[in-house]
């Protein structure tokens, strides 16, 4: 493999990287999209996302689904994983966590389109689902439903 590739600037992939202590210090990395100009959808699913309630410090859990139609850039998946892990000890409400993740990705990638669904497990008996997207979905790309069922409990 040649010395200078689209992966040459990556700092985290292929090496030991500590989990960032906060989302603010987490470094998201991107690589050039080798299929730029071809409309397609990328999906990341994080079924065990966690953060902390900013009031009680109790853990909150969510199933996240991130879909995006890339332009020039792709997110490097290890850096995304570490970014999501950085929320483990971060206190914020469900809405803030979900939208912050979406906006950080938009700022980094400048995608054609992005959406994130945060399907939060109940706290205080109420599940909270949070949805953010950059605009109408492109018509020329297959974008599957997120497929996360409404919370039912034992009912």
Curated annotation (Swiss-Prot):
It comes from the Bacteria. The active site is at 53 (thioimide intermediate), 60 (proton donor). GO terms for cellular component: cytoplasm. GO terms for biological process: queuosine biosynthetic process; tRNA modification. The keyword Oxidoreductase applies. InterPro entries: GTP-CH-I_C/QueF, NADPH_dep_7-cyano-7-deazaG_red, QueF, QueF_type1. It is found in: Cytoplasm. It catalyses: 7-aminomethyl-7-carbaguanine + 2 NADP(+) = 7-cyano-7-deazaguanine + 2 NADPH + 3 H(+). Gene3D superfamilies: 3.30.1130.10. GO terms for molecular function: preQ1 synthase activity. Catalyzes the NADPH-dependent reduction of 7-cyano-7-deazaguanine (preQ0) to 7-aminomethyl-7-deazaguanine (preQ1). NCBIfam families: QueF-II. HAMAP family: QueF_type1. This is NADPH-dependent 7-cyano-7-deazaguanine reductase. It comes from Brucella abortus (strain 2308).
């Amino acid at each position: 493999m040649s010395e200078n590739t689209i992966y040459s600037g990556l700092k985290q992939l292929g090496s030991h990287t500590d989990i960032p202590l906060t989302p603010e210090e987490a470094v998201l990395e991107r690589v050039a999209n080798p299929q730029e100009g071809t409309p397609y959808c990328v999906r990341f699913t994080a079924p065990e996302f966690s953060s902390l309630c900013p009031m009680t410090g109790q853990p909150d859990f969510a199933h996240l689904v991130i879909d995006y139609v890339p332009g020039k850039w792709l997110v490097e998946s290890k850096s995304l994983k570490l970014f999501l892990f950085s929320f483990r000890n971060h206190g914020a409400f469900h809405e803030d966590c979900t939208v912050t993740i979406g906006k950080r990705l938009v700022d980094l990638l400048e995608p054609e389109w992005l959406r994130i669904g945060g399907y939060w497990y109940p706290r205080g008996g109420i599940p909270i689902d949070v949805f953010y997207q950059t605009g109408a979905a492109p018509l020329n790309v297959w974008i599957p439903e997120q497929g996360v069922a409404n919370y039912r409990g034992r009912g």
